[in-house]
Regions:
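Conserved, hydrophobic alpha-helical core segments of structured domains
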Residues: 1-177
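Arginine-glycine-rich low-complexity intrinsically disordered regions
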Residues: 177-186
Length: 186
């Protein structure tokens, strides 16, 4: 459903009215990686529907608005903002601009922001951060989003592999994985 709808909206030139910034990013994408990123998110959603699993509209919206977010965040960084401030302001800006084209319910906005914010936190492998991430109510959606980002060459596969392993191992192994690496003294 999601994939077919996306293609139909593009085919009949309607997508640009619903997601103008994303449409512009798709047109300007020189890497050729954004369209497959969006398509994979749609296909994943279709798979979840077929398997009678829950679907989060916020996940799809987060995917569609990701490139506009990263462009604005990069611009904000170049203006001298801290990474956190650049990201937060970009989130607010992208959501505000998208709201001019389509209304996004507040409950979705919160979920979208959480999915985006967790992306930065996935890089922290030490201490309690991985445990807190695993317990976060948006972990699964953010983790699935992270996997999509590997295909856009934004994230190294080793990070996803580490997080996958961390979820699957016992508590003792998790503790070992989150301990600082000891340097050999000679």
């Amino acid at each position: 459903y999601a994939t077919d709808n996306f293609y139909q909206l593009k085919k009949y030139d309607l997508f640009k009215y619903l997601f103008p910034e994303t449409n512009q990013c798709l047109s300007d994408d020189e890497t050729g990686l954004l369209q497959p990123f969006v398509e994979q998110a749609m296909q994943n959603t279709d798979s979840r529907v077929r398997e009678n699993k829950p679907v989060m509209p916020a996940f799809l919206i987060a995917t569609l608005l990701w490139r506009p977010l990263t462009i604005k965040a990069r611009f904000n960084l170049e203006q001298g903002m801290t990474p956190y401030e650049a990201e937060q302001r970009a989130m607010t800006s992208v959501i505000k601009e998208q709201a001019q084209a389509t209304s996004i319910p507040k409950r979705f906005v919160q979920s979208i922001r959480e999915i985006w914010s967790l992306q930065r936190n996935f890089h922290s492998k030490r201490g309690m951060r991985p445990y807190k991430l695993l317990a976060h109510k948006r972990f699964r959606a953010a983790y699935d989003f992270l996997i999509l980002r590997v295909n856009m060459n934004e994230i190294d596969q080793s990070l996803v592999d580490w997080l996958t392993t961390f979820q699957e191992v016992d508590e003792v192994t998790q503790r070992k994985m989150t301990q600082p690496q000891k340097k050999n003294k000679k």
